[in-house]
Amino acid sequence: MKLNVSNELKSRLTHAAENGSVIAKDILSEVKKNVPVEEVIRGSYNFFSTKRKRTEAGTFKKIRIVFTACNKDLGHPNFPDRNNPQAPWFPENRTDLEPSTFIELFKNLGPYQPDEINYFCSAISLDSKVTIRLHDSMNDFMEAYLESNYSPISDGSESSLHNSCMRYEDKARNAADFYANFAGAKILVARDDSSNVVGRAIVWNEITLWKSINTPIAASLLDRIYSSHAFVVELIRKQAQEA
């Protein structure tokens, strides 16, 4: 029997890999091998999927992804619905797996560092490609700051973006006016496929730092990074370094 993965899990893995998760990229490579499941997975697990654990957090929902799989002996003569191809997907035939356990089931992968696992857990919770662009107009600042434009979900209840004190219209307008019209700053804005804001950061270009009294250094500075998902912070930093 070949490794069987649901369309939702494939989608989440694909987007997580596009968003920089090394683990998601590695798992996708294993999934695409099209080999018997026992060559890839430890134990008797197969028919992998995901489910979302939702927690209300005020104006947004915290989403935590739990992996699910079937580990029943589908060929056993006493297995209910033995000849039903949908049987592996019935809730009573499935078990929940934490992300770390799911990763460890892959024979040919790992070990991974804790920060790689944390990145994977965060990235897998957003089923979307993240796009980051640099803007400089007052309207761009306003859109990035207004709470109504934020993603409705986060990977944690303490989302720095959703808890920003500048998310209200009056404060957002004042901040946008200051940064765009007086300070001359720019803003990196991260959005999902639905154009929801999932992160932002102020960019100060061509500032002068002093290495010593007589040694000025021209530099750019990334400031005030806010995100709905932890991995987005790393994407913003990477984008800033490459810009």
Question: Which sequence ranges carry the predicted segments?
Answer:
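Non-catalytic substrate-recognition and accessory regions of acyl/acetyltransferase enzymes
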Residues: 1-243
